[in-house]
A protein has these predicted regions:
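Hydrophobic ligand-binding cavity/cleft-lining segments
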Residues: 1-45, 49
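Generic structural detector for well-ordered beta-strands
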Residues: 8-10, 39, 53, 66, ...
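A generic structural micro-feature
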Residues: 1, 40, 55-61, 88-92, ...
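Beta-strand/loop substructures that line and gate deep hydrophobic ligand-binding cavities in soluble
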Residues: 69, 78, 82-130
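A contiguous pocket-lining binding segment that forms or flanks enzyme active sites
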Residues: 135
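Intrinsic-disorder/low-complexity, polar/charged segments enriched in Ser/Thr/Lys/Arg/Asp/Glu/Gln
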Residues: 2-8, 45-47, 60-62, 76, ...
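Short, highly charged C-terminal tails/helix-capping segments
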Residues: 138-143
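Glycine-rich portal/gate segments that line the openings of hydrophobic small-molecule binding cavities
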Residues: 39-83
Length: 143
Protein backbone atom coordinates (compact mmCIF):
# COMPACT_ATOMS: atom_id res chain seq x y z
CA UNK A 1 0.00 0.00 0.00
CA UNK A 2 1.38 3.39 -0.98
CA UNK A 3 0.75 6.48 1.14
CA UNK A 4 1.77 10.04 0.25
CA UNK A 5 1.58 12.85 2.76
CA UNK A 6 2.59 16.51 2.86
CA UNK A 7 2.85 18.46 6.11
CA UNK A 8 3.87 22.10 6.38
CA UNK A 9 5.32 23.37 9.64
CA UNK A 10 6.32 26.74 11.02
CA UNK A 11 9.05 27.80 13.40
CA UNK A 12 10.58 30.98 14.70
CA UNK A 13 14.05 29.43 14.81
CA UNK A 14 16.68 30.47 12.25
CA UNK A 15 16.70 28.32 9.11
CA UNK A 16 20.38 27.34 9.62
CA UNK A 17 19.57 26.04 13.11
CA UNK A 18 16.58 24.00 11.89
CA UNK A 19 18.61 22.56 9.00
CA UNK A 20 21.40 21.49 11.37
CA UNK A 21 18.81 19.83 13.63
CA UNK A 22 17.19 17.77 10.86
CA UNK A 23 20.61 16.49 9.81
CA UNK A 24 21.16 15.13 13.34
CA UNK A 25 19.28 11.82 13.17
CA UNK A 26 19.83 11.13 16.86
CA UNK A 27 17.78 14.28 17.59
CA UNK A 28 15.36 13.93 14.67
CA UNK A 29 14.19 10.29 14.98
CA UNK A 30 12.84 10.60 18.57
CA UNK A 31 10.59 13.44 17.34
CA UNK A 32 8.39 10.71 15.84
CA UNK A 33 6.03 9.45 18.52
CA UNK A 34 7.08 5.94 19.61
CA UNK A 35 10.42 6.05 17.75
CA UNK A 36 13.87 5.63 19.22
CA UNK A 37 17.44 5.35 17.98
CA UNK A 38 19.02 1.99 18.77
CA UNK A 39 22.49 2.63 17.36
CA UNK A 40 24.37 5.15 15.25
CA UNK A 41 25.71 3.21 12.25
CA UNK A 42 27.45 5.99 10.34
CA UNK A 43 27.66 9.77 10.01
CA UNK A 44 24.31 9.86 8.19
CA UNK A 45 22.58 6.67 9.37
CA UNK A 46 21.07 5.02 12.44
CA UNK A 47 19.30 1.82 13.41
CA UNK A 48 15.94 2.72 14.89
CA UNK A 49 12.61 1.27 15.92
CA UNK A 50 9.09 2.53 16.29
CA UNK A 51 6.15 1.20 18.29
CA UNK A 52 2.91 1.87 16.40
CA UNK A 53 -0.67 1.27 17.45
CA UNK A 54 -3.26 0.80 14.69
CA UNK A 55 -6.69 0.23 16.06
CA UNK A 56 -6.44 -2.70 18.49
CA UNK A 57 -3.12 -3.84 17.00
CA UNK A 58 0.31 -2.82 18.25
CA UNK A 59 3.36 -3.37 16.07
CA UNK A 60 7.07 -2.73 16.33
CA UNK A 61 9.04 -1.90 13.21
CA UNK A 62 12.85 -1.87 13.30
CA UNK A 63 15.30 -0.88 10.61
CA UNK A 64 17.48 1.88 9.26
CA UNK A 65 17.14 5.61 8.76
CA UNK A 66 19.66 7.14 6.39
CA UNK A 67 20.16 10.59 4.92
CA UNK A 68 20.43 9.95 1.17
CA UNK A 69 20.46 13.51 -0.14
CA UNK A 70 21.56 16.86 1.26
CA UNK A 71 21.41 20.29 -0.37
CA UNK A 72 22.55 22.85 2.22
CA UNK A 73 22.20 25.78 -0.20
CA UNK A 74 18.54 24.93 -0.83
CA UNK A 75 17.96 23.79 2.79
CA UNK A 76 16.71 20.43 1.55
CA UNK A 77 17.32 16.92 2.90
CA UNK A 78 15.95 13.50 1.95
CA UNK A 79 16.09 10.45 4.18
CA UNK A 80 15.29 6.82 3.49
CA UNK A 81 13.53 4.68 6.09
CA UNK A 82 13.58 0.89 5.69
CA UNK A 83 12.00 -1.22 8.40
CA UNK A 84 10.58 -4.68 9.05
CA UNK A 85 7.78 -5.61 11.39
CA UNK A 86 9.20 -7.47 14.38
CA UNK A 87 7.55 -10.87 14.74
CA UNK A 88 5.72 -10.43 11.45
CA UNK A 89 6.22 -10.34 7.72
CA UNK A 90 5.36 -6.71 7.03
CA UNK A 91 7.54 -3.83 5.95
CA UNK A 92 7.28 -0.07 6.28
CA UNK A 93 9.60 1.84 3.98
CA UNK A 94 9.55 5.55 3.23
CA UNK A 95 11.29 8.44 1.60
CA UNK A 96 10.95 11.60 3.66
CA UNK A 97 11.92 14.93 2.10
CA UNK A 98 12.43 18.11 4.10
CA UNK A 99 12.32 21.50 2.37
CA UNK A 100 13.00 24.47 4.64
CA UNK A 101 12.19 28.14 4.21
CA UNK A 102 12.52 31.09 6.56
CA UNK A 103 9.84 30.51 9.17
CA UNK A 104 9.20 26.83 8.49
CA UNK A 105 9.09 24.27 5.74
CA UNK A 106 7.43 21.13 4.43
CA UNK A 107 7.78 17.42 5.16
CA UNK A 108 6.83 15.21 2.19
CA UNK A 109 6.48 11.49 2.90
CA UNK A 110 6.11 8.67 0.38
CA UNK A 111 5.61 5.40 2.25
CA UNK A 112 5.11 1.76 1.26
CA UNK A 113 3.39 -0.43 3.87
CA UNK A 114 2.87 -4.22 3.71
CA UNK A 115 1.75 -6.98 6.08
CA UNK A 116 -0.58 -6.63 9.07
CA UNK A 117 -0.40 -2.84 8.99
CA UNK A 118 -1.58 -2.73 5.37
CA UNK A 119 -4.38 -5.20 6.15
CA UNK A 120 -5.94 -2.59 8.44
CA UNK A 121 -7.07 -0.73 5.34
CA UNK A 122 -6.02 2.43 3.58
CA UNK A 123 -8.14 4.74 5.74
CA UNK A 124 -6.67 3.48 9.01
CA UNK A 125 -3.08 3.43 7.73
CA UNK A 126 -3.39 6.90 6.22
CA UNK A 127 -4.95 8.23 9.43
CA UNK A 128 -2.23 6.78 11.68
CA UNK A 129 0.62 7.97 9.43
CA UNK A 130 -0.98 11.39 9.02
CA UNK A 131 -1.26 11.79 12.80
CA UNK A 132 2.35 10.62 13.35
CA UNK A 133 3.79 12.98 10.76
CA UNK A 134 1.58 15.88 11.83
CA UNK A 135 2.84 15.45 15.41
CA UNK A 136 6.41 15.08 14.10
CA UNK A 137 6.08 18.26 12.02
CA UNK A 138 4.95 20.14 15.11
CA UNK A 139 8.00 18.92 17.04
CA UNK A 140 10.34 20.14 14.29
CA UNK A 141 9.61 23.67 15.45
CA UNK A 142 11.11 22.85 18.86
CA UNK A 143 14.37 21.24 17.69
Amino acid sequence: MAVRLEHPFSTEKPIDEVYAAILDLERLVPCVQGASVLEKTGPDSVKAQIDIKMGAMSMIFAGTVEIVEQDPEAYRMVMSVKSKEQGGSGYANAEVAFSLTDGGGTVNTNAQITGKAASMGEGVVHGVLDALINDFSGKLATL
